[in-house]
UniProtKB/Swiss-Prot annotation:
This is Protein hook. One of its GO terms (molecular function) is dynein light intermediate chain binding. The lineage of its organism: Eukaryota, Metazoa, Ecdysozoa, Arthropoda, Hexapoda. The keyword Coiled coil applies. It comes from the Eukaryota. Keywords: Coiled coil, Cytoplasm, Cytoskeleton, Developmental protein, Endocytosis, Endosome, Microtubule, Synapse. Involved in endocytic trafficking by stabilizing organelles of the endocytic pathway. Probably acts as a cytoskeletal linker protein required to tether endosome vesicles to the cytoskeleton. Involved in modulation of endocytosis at stages required for down-regulation of membrane proteins that control synapse size. Not involved in synaptic vesicle recycling. Required in R7 cells for boss endocytosis into multivesicular bodies (MVBs). Has a role in regulating adult longevity. Belongs to the hook family. Its main location: cytoplasm. The gene is hook.
């Protein structure tokens, strides 16, 4: 294990302790990102959800480094979002973002070390951080030191938005570092004491074995001494006999006894030495046990301190939450004070509105009095309408009779002119025919002195045709029979023409007699008198209509003023109602936010009832105002229609003495602006 990659291997050993489904034993297995995603899901399932985990492609990754890179990108983005959104940490630019491409292609250990460092920060700051910290504490000391260094590096490169530290708070960091140092020292002392205890136990076992051996030798010597004291014969037949001074046996026993005494002295010295050593070792064991008890107490204190640190962390978090709640409550208090002031203002405004409503009611009563006057005017207007309709019908009849008489007079005049022209023409034709007959009787057919220009067109045609026939007869040298027939035909035609001339003369005479007997001048005088009378009547009616129109215009001005005041009052009432509702809703919200127990149901019911009463009053007022507006609009429309009808009839009466084309050339009467506005 190199010094550069020591932190990576320590983080990998910690990562191996996690219970994951995906393989996570080496860098190649971690480079696909599946195990890292499962670990994040295990740390914070509320942030790294199962739907997010399903986006990580676990199957068909293999050696495809692009798929591995996409998985690692998702993991890195999720970790950064967790740091910024959930933990409220921002990583400083000196902490480089892990290179996903290098991990996916080359399994770069330094980049993978950064990624594992970020995952470690997530584990230390998640909801189950106590269990993961305990697992880290159960690792070896070297691994713990590397992991602690990784956490310190991550903490130095993070910056929290709210005051209070990085990944681990300053207070907990100092306490953890002190606890780790004390724990390492205690473990070293525990190992040294255990080694000493093991050595002393070995020495104790050796001394016990030596003691047992010495006891066995003593027993053997005592048995030999008892055997020698007996007066028995030995196996070689020599009588051992009693022990006497100077005997061989006595000397041997004396020598053996001295040897045994020396050995006893040596064994007693050794025993005393061993006793002293045993006492020293027992004292050492007692001291070591006391030391172990002290270390156990320190470990218990350390665990209690860890618990206190966790409690302090939770209390700091709760304190932050409480501070935030305090700020919100302060803001709500300020809003409540503002709302109190606003409610006072609204109460004053509501009092003003009540006074204004009373004034509006008085105005409505006044308008009710004016309503009776308007109805009287309406009845008068209706009577005038009926009179005007009758007069207009009479005028129409007179106009029609006048037009018929004028048309008859014009027709008679035209017929008279045409008859006079025909009479003159017939006289001329008659004179010419007389002259023609005289010329034929004398035998000079060609010597006609009558000018053809004075003859009528039909006679000229006939004469030309007869002359052509005469020429044809002369040129063709026909028989006398043909000439006789032609002469007979010509005579018949002349007789027919004479009969026509006689009938025309008779008709002229009858027409002249009729024209003289009818006397059209008298009729024209009578018609002119009737037209003058009708014009005088029309002028009287126009004067009456103008007077009624002036009265109607004055009434319309009053009605428009009243309608404008009513519309302004209605708009003000609507604005006041909207403001009142908003204020009531704000007051309800304020009462609910202050204390829901104060805002009882009775007060809410009272407020709702008052609101309903005000709404009903406003609806009734609005309905009465709408009815008044409808009646005024209806009267205005009737007056405008009546005025238009009168103006059109007056225009017709004024143009009755003119021709049809002259009346068409005249401009139509313009409609008033009030009618255009009302439409």
């Amino acid at each position: 294990m190199s010094a550069q990659n020591g932190m990576y291997y320590s983080l990998l050993e910690w990562f191996k302790t996690l219970n994951l489904n995906a393989p996570h034993a080496n860098a190649e297995e971690l480079s696909d990102g599946v195990a890292l995603a499962q670990a994040l899901n295990q740390f914070a399932p509320e942030s790294f959800t199962n739907s997010w985990l399903s986006k990580i492609k676990s199957s068909a990754v293999g050696s495809n480094w692009r798929l591995r890179m996409s998985n690692l990108k998702k993991v890195v983005e999720g970790v950064y979002e967790y740091y910024s959104d959930v933990l409220n940490y921002t990583l400083q630019p000196d902490f480089a973002k892990p290179d996903v491409q290098a991990i996916a292609e080359k399994c770069d250990l330094t980049e993978l070390e950064r990624l594992l460092q970020l995952v470690l920060g997530c584990a230390v700051n998640c909801a189950k951080k106590q269990s993961y910290i305990c697992e880290i504490m159960c690792l070896e000391e070297e691994l713990q030191a590397n992991i602690m260094r990784a956490l310190q590096d991550l903490e130095s490169s993070t910056r929290q938005s709210v005051e209070g530290g990085g990944v681990v708070s300053s207070m907990s960091r100092n306490s953890l570092s002190n606890m780790l140092e004390g724990n390492t020292k205690a473990q070293e002392e525990r190992d040294a004491m255990a080694q000493k205890c093991f050595e002393t136990e070995k020495k104790m076992l050796l001394l016990i074995d030596e003691k047992n051996n010495l006891q066995q030798e003593l027993q053997k010597i005592q048995q030999e001494f008892a055997r020698l004291e007996l007066n028995t014969i030995g196996d070689d037949g020599v009588s051992l006999g009693p022990i006497q001074a100077g005997s061989v046996r006595y000397n041997e026993l004396r020598r053996q006894l001295e040897l045994v005494k020396e050995e006893l002295l040596q064994s007693e010295g050794a025993r005393e030495d061993l006793k002293i050593k045993a006492q020293q070792q027992e004292a050492d064991i007692l001291h070591m046990q006391q030391r172990i008890d002290e270390l156990m107490k320190t470990t218990a204190e350390l665990t209690s301190l860890k618990d206190e640190v966790d409690v302090l962390r939770e209390s700091t978090e709760k304190l932050k939450v409480c501070e935030a709640q305090l700020e919100t409550y302060k803001k709500k208090l300020e809003e409540y004070n503002d709302l109190k002031k606003h409610v006072k203002m609204l109460e004053e405004r509501s009092a003003d509105y009540v006074q204004q409503n009373a004034q509006f009611e008085e105005d409505a009563k006044r308008y009710a009095n004016t309503k009776g006057q308007i109805e009287l005017f309406k009845k008068e207007i209706q009577d005038l309408h009926t009179k005007l309709d009758n007069e207009s019908s009479k005028n129409v009849k007179l106009e029609f009779d006048n037009k018929n008489l004028e048309s008859k007079a014009l027709a008679l005049q035209r017929e008279k002119d045409s008859l006079l022209k025909e009479r003159d023409n017939l006289r001329e034709a008659f004179d010419e025919l007389k002259c023609g007959q005289l010329s034929t009787n004398s035998g000079s057919l060609t010597g006609n002195t009558v000018s053809r220009e004075l003859q009528p067109a039909a006679m000229v045609d006939k004469i030309q045709r007869l002359e052509a026939e005469n020429k044809a007869l002369r040129e063709g040298q026909g028989g006398q029979t043909a000439l006789a027939q032609l002469l007979d035909d010509a005579n018949k035609r002349c007789e027919h023409l004479r009969e026509q001339i006689k009938a025309a003369n008779e008709r002229i005479l009858s027409l002249t007699h009729a024209s003289q007997s009818d006397d059209p001048i008298l009729k024209e005088n009578e018609l002119s008198k009737q037209i003058k009378q009708l014009m005088e009547l029309n002028e009287q009616k126009t004067l009456q209509i103008e007077e009624s129109s002036t009265q109607n215009s004055a009434m319309q001005c009053k009605i428009t003023q009243l309608e404008s005041t009513l519309s302004t009052r209605e708009q003000e009432l609507m604005a006041y109602e909207v403001k009142y509702r908003k204020c009531v809703e704000k007051a309800k919200e304020v009462i609910k936010t202050i204390d829901p127990r104060i805002a009882s149901g009775l007060e809410a019911n009272i407020l709702e009832k008052s609101i309903d009463v005000i709404e009903e009053e406003s609806k009734t007022k609005m309905s009465t105002m709408e009815e008044q507006l409808m009646t005024s609009a209806y009267y205005r429309l009737g007056v405008n229609a009546h005025r238009d009808a009168v103006e059109s009839k007056l225009a017709l009466l004024m143009g009755s003495g003119q021709t049809f084309l002259a009346r068409q050339r005249q401009s139509a009467p313009r409609k008033s602006l009030t009618t255009m506005k009302s439409k």
